[in-house]
């Protein structure tokens, strides 16, 4: 799964950062992702922490903050992720941060990049100055840095969300960060209404997992999923239930991240809260990649609920799109 959003900094922001690098006194440059999610633009240049706190207190969306202390020619690159900010925005900012840092350049940034969630805590940035020692850790690769950043955001989500799918006193990464929105218990739809096919999609605008289709599918051969974007599907065949995670080619990066980070939590919700035991968990790209033989009734030895862990993907079930080679020009 890609961990980059494709969003880049506007030239005006990069020019401002470069120009203010040699300025006297402290400089605080505030930036955010544009409403159309295509670029990062500068919103304000603050000259005091009081001004910074006032501006940040009015924001519900995350911010990027570049703080240059007096007497230092480097910025501290701060991620401000306010409590209560939308999940989609948090993930988008996490996946854009490293791209933005590369554009600004390592020569202009300190090795310390604080993550702050409360506007009042921004005043603590005054403790970051030229006297602070540089980090002694071995430099991380880009993928390692990106994964750490995403893990930070997911940890924040688990801390702030009221929905838990595992033990309430456990810090398990298998927690659900979205609320499941269903008028009836899902197991009741399967057991009482006779439906054996339920398809779910995530609505980031209100942070819920919703049922978009519930049907009776006579056989595996007639199973078909045709949705514009990722989805979770429960399919019941006889006494066996299957969970299908589909992420079609062309899905947006931010959607891929949201669905991937909530998959295990949703499976645990279905298992623990709805008492649905899955024989297999299948992950596919486009629906045409689904090997329907995987959805045949399985015996106890094959069932994931008898000795295997459904939270870990079965490698034999994973299928990926084969990259297409370049098209050759037809000779005439």
Curated annotation (Swiss-Prot):
Q: Which GO terms describe its molecular function?
A: actin filament binding; actin monomer binding; protein sequestering activity
A single GO BP: barbed-end actin filament capping
Provide the alphabetized UniProt keywords. Answer: Actin-binding, Cytoplasm, Cytoskeleton, Phosphoprotein, Repeat
List where Basic residues composition bias occurs.
321-332
Q: Where is this region: Disordered?
A: 301-332
InterPro entries referenced in this protein's UniProt entry, alphabetically = ADF-H, ADF-H/Gelsolin-like_dom_sf, Twinfilin
Q: From the Swiss-Prot or TrEMBL record, state where the protein is found.
A: Cytoplasm, Cytoskeleton
Residue stretches making up the ADF-H domain: 5-132, 173-300
Recorded hits in Gene3D superfamilies, A to Z, give:
Severin
- One Gene Ontology cellular component annotation? actin filament
- Phosphoserine-modified residues are 167, 172
The family this protein is said to belong to: Belongs to the actin-binding proteins ADF family. Twinfilin subfamily.
**Listed PANTHER family:** TWINFILIN (PTHR13759:SF1)
Additional observations: Present with 1470 molecules/cell in log phase SD medium.
State the oligomer form and interacting partners: Interacts with G-actin; ADP-actin form.
Q: What is this protein called?
A: Twinfilin-1
Q: What is the lineage of its organism?
A: Eukaryota, Fungi, Dikarya, Ascomycota, Saccharomycotina
